Curated annotation (Swiss-Prot):
InterPro entries: ATP-synt_VA_C, ATPase_a/bsu_AS, ATPase_A1-cplx_bsu, ATPase_F1/V1/A1_a/bsu_N, ATPase_F1/V1/A1_a/bsu_nucl-bd, P-loop_NTPase, V-ATPase_su_B/beta. HAMAP family: ATP_synth_B_arch (MF_00310). One of its GO terms (molecular function) is proton-transporting ATP synthase activity, rotational mechanism. One of its GO terms (biological process) is proton motive force-driven plasma membrane ATP synthesis. It is a peripheral membrane protein. GO terms for cellular component: plasma membrane; proton-transporting two-sector ATPase complex, catalytic domain. The lineage of its organism: Archaea, Thermoproteota, Thermoprotei, Desulfurococcales, Desulfurococcaceae. This is A-type ATP synthase subunit B. The gene is atpB. It holds the Pfam family ATP-synt_ab_N. Has multiple subunits with at least A(3), B(3), C, D, E, F, H, I and proteolipid K(x). It comes from Desulfurococcus sp. (strain SY).
Length: 463
């Protein structure tokens, strides 16, 4: 029953504890746990039976004793205190300030699992979000309300890319408030300091809310951290009409925490030991994005995950790909070449790109230019493999130009400085500069009128 306190903890294992002899306990109910020394921790009911409750402890079960630990069931679900004062602040994985500032005075308290959204109430994602990164803006455009994950690998610079996107992202042509909600799960102290420094030194912290769960924090916190972040994002987007970009890193650490809890509960494992309900669980995070009819605000998600062994068929990226609307893939080969950001545009995809670009959104030539750049780069990459077999001497003059185009595309279009913020017009013009490397007869995917208007050869004549 709500408010009842029990000292009937029968077992503690991993992040879980079993409380026996309970009555009227509900799934998802918040509990307060008190140790013999008076220390208080929070937990949540994972499973409720007739007279037994399985509780997950957010701060971990270290130093808890079955004989001296008491548990009080509050009768409430986990709620997040929300306020506009959270902008510019840094919190730990369960929402406590860690920046030395005061506690937040909440304007409201929201359920951490969010309010259910009628699918009919959803508005289709549209409108271009400029990240300042050519490989994304030009080739795999991010659209307001989209879910576009970044598939990375261990040792690749996804943290730098996340910080750069958080710093540079903006909605063009509108006087709208833009905010970033950044949630990091299972990161090291070094990574946490990098993110803090990056946000604070560039002033991006003023429009951001940071949730940082460190590697030595209890793994169970990682289950709550992204939901905390999304609850705050929903508040900013749908109560204050803000355009919110949510960056979640690293979703692989989240899935590992999910597997740890599943193993502790002795559930039947699914693929590679992950719980069979991981798809559903990930969907409860990724589907908390988008736009709502009648509301000006939006939530755009960019989850980041490191693929174990660079395996894109691993259950985490595999299931993520089913739920989200594309992927940005980082390449170890490009990283070895010293190219930052090492975005491989060929396996990357933004399924909603067509709805956020073109006349009135970016520029009229954008869709066809992106197709032409993609086709030319794919041809150049294919010819590299051929050269490895037959040598460059066997290639035609046009083939050699494709090879040169592929090299320049990587060095000039994909590659850019960490502090370089390219506008979409700079990106598109750069694309045309590179296409000038090829014979005009090879530009078969672009209308003649766009060639006459934007191709450097004709543009310079017009000037």
């Amino acid at each position: 029953m709500p408010g009842m306190e029990y000292s009937t903890v029968s077992k503690i294992y991993g992040p879980l504890m079993i409380v026996e002899g309970v009555k009227g306990v509900a799934y998802g109910e918040v509990v307060e746990i008190e140790t013999e020394s008076g220390e208080k921790r929070k937990g949540q009911v994972l499973e409720a039976r007739e007279n037994l409750a399985i509780v997950q402890v957010f701060e971990g079960t270290r130093d808890l004793d079955v004989k001296t630990t008491s548990v009080r069931f509050t009768g409430e679900t986990l709620k997040v205190p929300v306020s506009m004062d959270m902008l510019g602040r840094i919190f730990n994985g369960i929402g406590k300030p860690i920046d030395g500032g005061p506690e937040i005075i909440p304007e409201d308290r929201r359920d951490v699992h969010g309010a259910p959204l009628n699918p009919v109430a959803r508005a289709y994602p549209r409108d271009f979000i400029q990240t300042g990164i050519s490989a994304i803006d030009g080739m795999n455009t991010l659209v307001r309300g989209q879910k576009l994950p970044i598939f990375s690998g261990s040792g690749l610079p996804h943290n730098m890319l996340a910080a750069q996107i958080a710093r540079q992202a903006k909605v063009l042509g509108e006087e709208e408030q833009f905010a970033v909600v950044f949630a990091a799960m299972g990161i090291t102290y070094e990574e946490a300091n990098f993110f803090k420094k990056s946000f604070e030194e560039t002033g991006a912290i003023e429009r951001a809310v940071l949730f940082l769960n460190l590697a030595d924090d209890p793994a169970i916190e990682r289950i709550i951290t992204p939901r905390m972040a999304l609850t705050v994002a929903e508040y900013l987007a749908f109560d204050y009409d803000m355009q919110v970009l949510v960056i979640l890193t690293d979703m692989t650490n989240y899935a590992e925490a999910l597997r740890e809890i599943s193993a502790a509960r002795e559930e039947v494992p699914g693929r590679r030991g992950y719980p069979g309900y991981m798809y559903t669980d990930l969907a409860t995070i990724y589907e908390r994005g988008g736009r709502v009819r009648g509301k000006k605000g939006s939530i755009t998600q960019m989850p980041i995950l490191t693929m174990p062994d660079d395996d894109i068929t691993h259950p985490i990226p595999d299931l993520t790909g089913y739920i989200t609307e594309g992927q940005i893939v980082l390449s170890r080969e490009l990283h070895r070449k010293g190219i930052y950001p090492p975005i491989d545009v060929l396996p990357s995809l933004s399924r909603l790109m067509k709805d956020g670009i073109g006349k009135g959104r970016t520029r009229e030539d954008h869709p066809q230019l992106a197709q032409q750049l993609y086709a030319a780069y794919a041809e150049g990459r294919s010819l590299r493999d051929l050269v490895a077999v037959v040598g460059e001497e066997a290639l035609s003059e046009t083939d050699r130009k494709y090879l040169k185009f592929a090299d320049r595309f990587e060095r000039e279009f994909i590659a850019q400085r960490y502090d370089e913020d390219r506008s979409i017009f700079e990106t598109l013009d750069l694309g045309w500069e590179l296409l000038a490397e090829l014979p005009e007869s090879e530009l078969k995917r672009v209308r003649k009128e766009y060639i006459l208007k934007y191709h450097p050869k004709y543009r310079k004549r017009g000037e």
